[in-house]
Amino acid sequence: MYVEVLKSKIHRVTITEANLNYVGSITIDEDLMDAANIIAGEKVQIVDNNNGARLETYTIPGKRGSGVICLNGAAARIVHPGDIIIIMAYAWMPMEEAKVFKPAVVFPDTATNKIILK
């Protein structure tokens, strides 16, 4: 049996931009993506701590070291600059593997979006 489990989490990061006219997705500083083991184009779930909204989209790498977190497309109407969000990615794996699997969890500084703990 396979189960879906948390694979990656960027816990409490601040939205720096929102671009309504972009095709879609979330742009994430590539340093954060690497630290959380999230790849370009990967499906992620976004949870907005300010308004409780949840949505799914895919990732686009942003400039390394920039701290950029930009919601693009329709999501820009739901999540706004200054909001604190959690970004999560999931993976399917066999039950026995899932029991011992440890997700990559990153804790950025919400003022700079730089990694302070992982």
UniProtKB/Swiss-Prot annotation:
EC id: 4.1.1.11
**UniProt-listed GO biological process terms:** alanine biosynthetic process; pantothenate biosynthetic process
Catalytic residues in the record: S25, Y58
* Record GO terms (molecular function): aspartate 1-decarboxylase activity
Q: What class of enzyme is it?
A: lyase
Residue positions where Pyruvic acid (Ser) is found in the record: S25
Pathway connected to this protein: Cofactor biosynthesis; (R)-pantothenate biosynthesis; beta-alanine from L-aspartate: step 1/1
Q: Which cofactor does it need?
A: pyruvate
A single GO cellular-component term from the record reads:
cytosol
**Compartments where located:** Cytoplasm
Chemical reaction(s) catalysed: L-aspartate + H(+) = beta-alanine + CO2
- What Pfam families does this protein's entry cite? Asp_decarbox
Q: How does it assemble?
A: Heterooctamer of four alpha and four beta subunits.
Provide the protein name.
Answer: Aspartate 1-decarboxylase
Which lineage do the record's taxonomy fields give for this organism? Answer: Bacteria, Pseudomonadati, Bacteroidota, Bacteroidia, Bacteroidales
